[in-house]
């Protein structure tokens, strides 16, 4: 749909400028602090839920966290760690923080209700918007740990999701799905 195309354009562009916009708005909270706080989510709520569901700790959680880019840390911090909704309900957040006046926050507030409604209506697991050049997940309804990572060289590059992305990326223009 033209709505989804516009959303992709807006998310893709604002994804690139978000770090600068957020640093200006937040001032003192540096990347190291955000990284520590986000790590507490990986080890805490996420790690505990993983243990409850699987009877063991995730062996890959350190590898996943250590492969996060500064960009991914900023996005996951804003939309996962600093999200007041509990694990499994992160999708209920429309705007990360009322003080966040970034282009990305405005795009999220505009498009997220539409994608959330579409997901619920059709029963999808999640809806992702992925930058076709960088492989970065620039938007996700559910904001799980793959959010804001690259499917080309990030922690999920060697998953089925990463493989599917690369397969689609390799399709020639004449063969593209319309």
Language-model regions, residue ranges each:
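Juxtamembrane extracytoplasmic/periplasmic/luminal helical "stalk" adjacent to the first N-terminal
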Residues: 1-103, 116, 120-125
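Extracytoplasmic/periplasmic ligand-binding sensor regions of membrane-associated signaling proteins
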Residues: 76, 81-89, 93-178
